[in-house]
């Protein structure tokens, strides 16, 4: 290559390098900007769920009569708060179909645990799916058929009890997460427990009921 040709190409090479460097710096600035960082965090946090968790409404239930709610069984028979009187009742509000396997395992466990299917204690799982939709879960996990399940298809009861703003809700404002409400024989809420870890709670809940029943 002649010296003359080399000198002609050098400015263009320099310009190209400068443009690449400028574009790279610009990308890094945009990527690290607070607005972009916050947007990314918002997507990662709570699977895009709006609003911060708030359990005040749920916690306020303790010591009060269970609010008047309506739930339906697979045959569309309606159940209200009055129907839960007469024995200790554990209401397990959860995400249903979308919460596999954690919620399903808990529901199936309640169904097979004699302690929660007696004349003293009953466990009722509440999902926001329809009864027809829930049949797909039973087909996949037949053990779920033993669980007593009621349906809150419009999430009305879940909203009324404060289930949609808990820490465990992965779709905050729309669906419950993994929350328990213990109601005594007189229909008074004695204990609430929201579990973001979605662990099995049979033993803990049974012991809590024994403690409350002393």
Identify the meaning behind each predicted range:
Residues 70-71, 182:
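Hydrophobic beta-strand positions
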Residues 75-77, 186:
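Residue-level recognition of short loop/turn positions
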Residues 79-110:
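Short active-site neighborhood of thiol/selenol oxidoreductases, capturing the structured segment around
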Residues 145-148, 163-169, 173-181:
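Structural micro-motif
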Residues 172-214:
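Thiol-/selenol-based redox modules, centered on thioredoxin-like
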């Amino acid at each position: 290559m002649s010296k003359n040709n080399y000198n002609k190409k050098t400015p263009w090479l320099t310009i190209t390098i400068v443009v690449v460097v400028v574009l790279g710096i610009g990308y890094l600035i945009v990527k690290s900007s607070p607005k972009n960082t916050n947007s990314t965090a918002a997507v990662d946090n709570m699977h895009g769920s709006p609003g911060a968790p708030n359990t005040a409404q749920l916690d306020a239930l303790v010591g009060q009569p269970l609010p008047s709610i309506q739930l339906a069984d697979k045959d569309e028979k309606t159940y209200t708060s009055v129907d839960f009187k007469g024995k200790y009742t554990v209401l397990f509000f959860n995400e249903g179909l979308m919460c596999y396997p954690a919620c399903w395992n808990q529901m199936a466990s309640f169904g097979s645990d004699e302690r929660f299917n007696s004349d003293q204690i009953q466990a009722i799982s509440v999902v926001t799916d329809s009864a027809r939709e829930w049949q797909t879960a039973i087909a996949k996990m037949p053990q779920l058929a033993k669980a007593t399940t009621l349906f809150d298809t419009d999430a009305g009861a879940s909203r009324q009890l404060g289930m949609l703003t808990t820490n465990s809700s992965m779709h905050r404002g729309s669906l419950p997460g993994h929350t328990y409400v213990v109601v005594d024989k007189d229909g008074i809420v004695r204990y609430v427990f929201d579990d973001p870890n979605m662990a099995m709670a049979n033993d803990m809940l049974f012991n809590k009921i024994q403690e409350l029943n002393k």
